[in-house]
């Protein structure tokens, strides 16, 4: 029995064993989760380790509108276009979080004729990786509080416990809570809160680990709090790294699915880019690089967030070598950054589209700082006019930018052929080897300022008192050699979501700096960024339903826009 794509009847899904066979994986190399998705065994990954790397294509974007610019859709469509040109290609993407799926942006599996399948399964639980991360994280939380409750032999100061709890849902009411109420039998009262699962350090660690040994070692190094005399307390001090790792046994294995055009896709891990590193697992990406000639991966939000972190954190840790950046832009986003109200973005306005290119230009120039080539993917929406598309293409080409319009949502791989050909052309003339923006052994303040000034355009940094105290502890205990993973709004190049276009002469405010010693980076938290989102007035949950036959509706993202872009 064949399975028809519930969203588009033009393609049939193939059994996952058939998809695996196209990239050299046998049925013994995978563990099937139903008929159309599977985990890839670690033994299979080891078997292909000696193969040469494929060309790694990183998809990023200009500063997005609140609805996103279709970066996941473009990533999938580009992979399909490369496959149409006869290139062995795999898409390596992140898993959706339930928070955005039920929140403002909806599903995260692409759109139109450029999706990953099975859509509903991937958006809702998938292979339970997020549930495993949530359980592992909260086990450590429970063990920390249990240690304080029972004799507190580690001398943990409850006021200085830094390890919060997580939930894979948008819920502003859990950001700040008090636990341990109801008398001594119910624990030691203290203030804490919940973050969303994609911001969990366990998620970051999972996406930066290649083996159970490495995973367990990183978990052992997690900082959970401080003692009464300000000495750090690590997860290893609690002797619980083995139990936490055990919960992640299957979550470490990459997931294999397929696109609308039956191109293999490895979907694994899901850290957000505004509050974490924002890319899929290095294990999944490395596997894809061994099994294909071209790998298309994405980094969340604009280039200032996910892509910067990819170059400065993920690629060095993973030994990855991105050779080209595909920078997604839309006429809608260009008009938005020219000051056009969201309600008027569907009205034709070529002049505004060109005026908004200041934001796009900044991202394009930033890419050059990492010594990699770039092509702009002008992702077409149904509301775009030919006049607008042509005006943007002319303006970009007049400035010497590489640009290719694409209609990937409507046409699938066919709509991305020009983009694929331009990408291959640039790859043919590109040498390997990118350059990091800063060295990890620089002072923490220098690393933060380098990113803020070079990538965002800030003129200085304002450290709040808590951040200053954090810096003292970071330097005292030797965490200062870690890279910085700056948490910042995705809606602006600055830390103020209201500053659109190309902000100038602004100061970035650092409220605090969290230590993610297990994952191996520091998290300066800027502006008003939150690690637990809230639901909008009209969340996507209101549009999701299931009928008597079990058919789910409303999960696919509106307009095909990824909730992770």
From Swiss-Prot:
Question: Which PROSITE patterns does the UniProt entry name for this protein?
Answer: FTHFS_1 (PS00721), FTHFS_2 (PS00722)
Please name every pair of cysteines joined by a disulfide bond in this record. Answer: none
List the taxonomic lineage.
Answer: Bacteria, Pseudomonadati, Thermodesulfobacteriota, Syntrophia, Syntrophales
Pfam families in the record: FTHFS
Protein's GO biological process: tetrahydrofolate interconversion
* UniProt keywords, alphabetically: ATP-binding, Ligase, Nucleotide-binding, One-carbon metabolism
Provide the transmembrane region boundaries.
Answer: none
Which residues does the annotation say bind ATP? 65-72
Q: Which HAMAP family match?
A: FTHFS
State the reactions this protein catalyses: (6S)-5,6,7,8-tetrahydrofolate + formate + ATP = (6R)-10-formyltetrahydrofolate + ADP + phosphate
Kindly list the GO molecular function terms attached to this UniProt entry: ATP binding; formate-tetrahydrofolate ligase activity
The family database entries (InterPro entries) matched by this protein are listed as: Formate_THF_ligase, Formate_THF_ligase_CS, P-loop_NTPase
Family classification:
Belongs to the formate--tetrahydrofolate ligase family.
Instruction: Give a yes or no for keyword Nucleotide-binding in this entry.
Output: yes
**Pathway connected to this protein:** One-carbon metabolism; tetrahydrofolate interconversion
Protein name (Swiss-Prot/TrEMBL): Formate--tetrahydrofolate ligase
Q: What is its EC number?
A: 6.3.4.3
Q: Which gene encodes it?
A: fhs
* Keyword Ligase set for record: yes
């Amino acid at each position: 029995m064949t399975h028809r794509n519930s969203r588009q009847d033009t393609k049939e899904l193939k059994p996952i064993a058939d998809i695996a066979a196209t990239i050299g994986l046998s049925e013994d190399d995978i563990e099937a989760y139903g008929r159309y998705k599977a985990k890839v065994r670690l033994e299979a990954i080891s078997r292909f380790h000696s193969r040469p790397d494929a060309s790694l294509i990183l998809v990023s974007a200009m500063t997005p509108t609140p609805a996103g610019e279709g970066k996941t859709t473009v990533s999938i469509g580009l992979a399909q276009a490369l496959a149409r040109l006869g290139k062995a290609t795999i898409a390596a993407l992140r898993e959706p979080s339930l928070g955005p799926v039920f929140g403002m942006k909806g599903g995260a599996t692409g759109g139109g004729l450029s999706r990953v399948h099975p859509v509903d399964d991937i958006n809702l639980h998938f292979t339970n990786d997020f549930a495993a991360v949530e359980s592992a994280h909260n086990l450590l939380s429970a063990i920390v509080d249990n240690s304080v409750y029972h004799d507190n032999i580690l001398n943990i100061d409850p006021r200085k416990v830094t390890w919060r709890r997580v939930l894979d849902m948008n819920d502003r009411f859990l950001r700040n809570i008090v636990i341990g109420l109801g008398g001594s039998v119910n624990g030691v009262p203290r203030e804490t809160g919940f973050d969303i699962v994609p911001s969990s350090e366990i998620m970051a660690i999972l996406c930066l680990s290649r083996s159970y040994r490495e995973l367990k070692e990183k978990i052992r190094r997690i900082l959970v709090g401080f003692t009464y005399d300000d000495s750090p307390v690590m997860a290893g001090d609690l002797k619980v790294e083995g139990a936490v790792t055990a919960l992640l046994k299957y979550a470490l294995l990459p997931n294999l699915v397929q696109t609308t055009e039956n191109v293999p896709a490895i979907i694994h891990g899901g850290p957000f880019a505004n509050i974490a590193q924002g890319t899929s697992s290095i294990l999944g990406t490395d596997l894809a690089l061994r099994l294909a000639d071209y790998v298309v991966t994405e980094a969340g939000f604009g280039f200032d967030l996910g892509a910067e972190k990819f170059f400065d954190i993920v690629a060095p840790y993973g030994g990855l070598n991105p050779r080209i950046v595909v920078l997604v832009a839309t006429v809608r986003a260009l008009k938005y950054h020219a000051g056009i109200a969201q309600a008027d973005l569907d009205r034709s306005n070529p002049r505004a589209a060109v005026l908004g290119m200041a934001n796009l230009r900044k991202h394009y120039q930033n890419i050059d700082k990492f010594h990699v080539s770039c092509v702009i993917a002008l992702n077409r929406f149904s509301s775009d006019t030919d006049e607008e598309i042509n005006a943007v293409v002319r303006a970009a080409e007049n400035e010497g930018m590489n640009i290719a319009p694409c209609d990937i949502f409507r046409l699938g791989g066919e709509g991305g052929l020009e983009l694929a050909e331009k990408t291959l052309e640039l790859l043919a003339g590109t040498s390997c080897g990118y350059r990091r923006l800063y060295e990890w052994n620089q002072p923490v303040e220098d690393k933060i300022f380098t990113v803020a000034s070079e990538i965002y355009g800030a003129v200085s940094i304002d450290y709040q008192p808590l951040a200053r105290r954090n810096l003292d502890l970071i330097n005292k205990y030797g965490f200062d050699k870690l890279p910085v993973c700056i948490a910042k709004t995705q809606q602006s190049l600055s830390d103020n979501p209201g500053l659109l276009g190309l902000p100038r002469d602004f100061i970035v405010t650092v409220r605090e700096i969290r230590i993610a010693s297990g994952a191996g980076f520091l998290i300066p938290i800027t502006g008003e960024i939150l690690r637990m989102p809230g639901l909008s007035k009209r969340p996507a949950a209101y549009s999701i339903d299931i009928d008597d036959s079990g058919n789910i509706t409303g999960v696919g993202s509106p307009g095909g826009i990824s909730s992770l872009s």
